[in-house]
Amino acid sequence: MIILITVLRALPLAFAVTALVAGAASRPAAACTTFMLERGSERVVGKSYDWYMGQGLVVVNKRGIAKQSPPVKPGDRAARWVSRHASVTFNQYGREFPTGGMNDAGLVVEVMWLDSSIYERPDARPSLNELQWTQYQLDNFTSVAEMIAAAPGLRVSPVYARVHYLACDRSGACAAFENIGGKQIITPGARALTNNSYADSVAWAAMQKVVPAGPSSLERFTRAARLAAAPPAGDLMAGAFAVLDFVRSPRSQWNIVYDPVHLRVSFRTRANREIKTLDLGKLDASCAESAALVDIDTNPGGDVASRLRPYDVATNRSLIERSLQRIRKRLPAGAVELMAGYPSALACQAP
């Protein structure tokens, strides 16, 4: 409650009042928000995952795994790599295809919907689908600067979703990665992202004299960006969860707060509001043992490391089938089978 009051005081009075009654307004189905808060040497990244379903797995991915991206379209050239970093990811569409996560170097990558995304045309570069792109970054890089340097050599070949990405690292560097008009656009310094392009969001926010309380992407961006520029007083982790309350919608499913400095992940869900935590520094990163997972709605709260269990194909397939049920007819033939079976083809190369 103290944190909520602090956040209210950090915003103009007109917003603070209307924010408390804005919950009844209708929200779009895809209303995700990601932001970074920073104070001194402390940094956290918050993510509100707003979707029409909330099932998911929290996955501990190991370093030393040899991987090859599955082709999405005829002519796609596979990307090949060996994971250099372990990571904790949040997966609704199966292992290796996360909606976001953080690696053991403190690099955070999160995915949000962007209707205006137009991906680059097929060419000779290696390609990854729109979700595996996130896992590739977490597997390979320690910083946003490394991601930016490597980005021109890779393209996204989408299965279905039109998305963009916000990446932040333990130094406080952030960048938005987008596909606009068939070109990859990277914006270093972005500290917040919702469901409009970063450029459009910044332009709209600059015209607002009072912080808006509405549910639209541009309104949520304005709130998140201004709070990112002036974080609420007090504990930064608690402040991030309070900010997530201010950008939430009736479809908010997951609230995630990453601490890239201390390599800690905290999360809560619509189905279980107790905060759960995982400490990457205490997890087994070696691929000598299987990837591990836990249901995102696990109960009770607290450290869930003891509830992690070895990855199994049946759990992965069940999640994918549930999550793709509504759009399965619009996916390429065999997509579900490919996604469900893909992790079984991965091998530990350097335990």
Regions picked out by a protein language model, each given a short descriptive name:
Residues M1-V7:
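N-terminal secretory signal peptides that target proteins for export/translocation
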Residues A10-G23:
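Bacterial N-terminal signal peptides
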Residues A25-A31:
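Sec/Tat signal peptide C-region and signal peptidase I cleavage site
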Residues T33-R95, M112-D139, V163, D169-P351:
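C-terminal, well-structured catalytic/ligand-binding subdomain of enzymes
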Residues T142-S143:
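Extracytoplasmic mature domains of secreted/periplasmic and thylakoid-lumen proteins
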Residues E146-L166, A173:
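Secretory/export targeting leaders with adjacent low-complexity proregions
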